[in-house]
Amino acid sequence: KLANRSLLFDDAGEVVAEYDKIHMFDVNLGAESYRESDNFTHGERAVLAETPWGGLGITVCYDLRFPALYRALAQAGAGMLAIPSAFTVPTGRAHWHVLLRARAIETGCFVFAPAQCGTHYGRRRTYGHSLIVDPWGEVLAEGGETPGVIAANIDLGAVAEARVKVPSLRHDRPFALPARLATE
């Protein structure tokens, strides 16, 4: 099987970090269904890369739906999160913006989310709408449904500022899990 891998390159073109997607996109959306695990193996470790600008947490696409991963990256030192994605049109319309803004707010991180757009293999349609989100959850730049480049000026001091205003990472506490309810 293959790995759905995100690579981070330095300014000399050398690979300085590799992340293998942990959560496989195995879903049934009604008209569309996907079983990413049929062709890809899942990763087993979170990746935090040191960059000249600070810690960068690296994830991929469907990982976005698992907030504990992002909280762990932020608590380990990430001030920025990279989330390259290929959300489907139905899931993108419903969830893309709110999930990215939530991860930025929960972690107090900048979120960089490049997103595939268009129709692939004549059937799979991806949403696009690349985003850059600040630690307060404000969208700084957004792409559309066609290929393009987005950019935004960022102030990394906004990470500390957001975390001082709402110090949820410091307030995080362990807790006992509830017993599972019986299901029919």
Predicted segments, located by residue:
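Short beta-strand-to-turn element immediately C-terminal to the catalytic PLP-Schiff-base lysine
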Residues: 8-10, 133-134, 152-153
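Short helix-loop capping/hinge motifs at secondary-structure junctions, enriched
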Residues: 14-17, 138-140, 160-161
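CN hydrolase (nitrilase-like) catalytic-core segments centered on the catalytic cysteine
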Residues: 55, 61-150
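A short C-terminal boundary segment appended to hydrolase-like catalytic domains
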Residues: 157-184
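Active-site/binding-pocket entry motifs
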Residues: 24-25, 88, 118, 158
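Active-site catalytic loop in hydrolytic enzyme cores
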Residues: 1-76, 89-98, 164-168
